[in-house]
UniProtKB/Swiss-Prot annotation:
Localization of this protein: Cell inner membrane
Listed name of the protein: Sec-independent protein translocase protein TatA
GO molecular function: protein transmembrane transporter activity
Keywords: Cell inner membrane, Cell membrane, Membrane, Protein transport, Translocation, Transmembrane, Transmembrane helix, Transport
Gene: tatA
Protein topology in the membrane: Single-pass membrane protein
Xref: InterPro entries: TatA/B/E, TatA/E
Highest taxon above the source species: Bacteria
Origin species: Verminephrobacter eiseniae (strain EF01-2)
Organism lineage: Bacteria, Pseudomonadati, Pseudomonadota, Betaproteobacteria, Burkholderiales
């Protein structure tokens, strides 16, 4: 029960091909590949387009002053 032999994996592969068919498996592979590529491109774009978080916070509060009064609880 520890490891699976090559025969086990071949039977599993055969069952998957019979259940889904080769065309459906090809479509799933294509969709998965395009999703991974899109994720990698998005991560690359996000890394180059954004500034560090400290700089963003300082820029947004440096331009404006906020004056707030608090009400005592009573």
């Amino acid at each position: 029960m520890g490891t699976f032999s090559i025969w086990h994996w071949l039977i599993v592969l055969l069952v998957v091909v019979v259940v889904f068919g080769t065309k459906k498996l090809r479509n799933i592979g294509t969709d998965l590949g395009s999703a991974v590529k899109g994720f990698k491109d998005g991560m690359k774009d996000a890394a180059t387009d954004t500034a560090p978080a400290g700089q963003v916070a300082n820029q947004s509060t440096a331009d404006q002053t906020i004056d707030v009064q608090t009400k005592p609880k009573g």
